[in-house]
Amino acid sequence: MKKDILTEINVYHTVLSPQRGYNIDNKKIKAEAVKGYVLSAKRMEEKDCWEYKDYKFISPCTELSFLDTAIKDEFFAATKKSIKLKDRWVNIYEHLEQSYSRNSLYLNSYAESPWYTCIYCCDVVKDSSELIIEYDNVTKINKLNKYKIENNKLFIFPSTLRYFFSENFSEDPNIFITHTYNLNI
């Protein structure tokens, strides 16, 4: 009997650590991320939009390019596919705050939508929140998969998947950097 795989959804995750050859100074990245938050440099000014809580980088630091290279290297090692950065933004969730359920698609133009979403846990309190990814499988609709967060942890998944961050139970804010990528074809 032959088998044809029609769909396969993968979520790639790892921790970028010095033992893996990555020495990313996330304090510098955090400083730039917080700057956009403090100056209220929002990606979208409409309060009814889920992008209202997304903040721009005011002046991206060199560490962000190191992070981007690490993400590309990790993805290539896992998939043998090359990706290029499309967009990047910051999300900061205070005590008892959670995010909206969203995906990274451009609903008015699927052709312009990114292929992959990458979440980087820049400065988080371990186990204070979870990344929750929603997906459909053959037998269930809106199935949830929960992932623990920790500093320097990286998640890469298709941009069609909806995701959100659960409530932050820590007294400290959790800082996430979201990247979107296209395939280099």
Question: How would you label these PLM feature ranges?
Answer:
Residues 1-82:
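Non-heme Fe(II)/2-oxoglutarate
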Residues 117-119, 154, 171-185:
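A short hydrophobic beta-strand segment most commonly corresponding to one strand
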Residues 8-10, 84-86, 114-116, 173-175:
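Residues at beta-strand starts and edge strands
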Residues 80-81, 147, 168, 172-173:
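Exposed regions on extracellular, virion, or secretory-pathway luminal proteins
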Residues 87-156, 160-161, 166:
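Catalytic core of non-heme Fe(II) oxygenases with the double-stranded beta-helix
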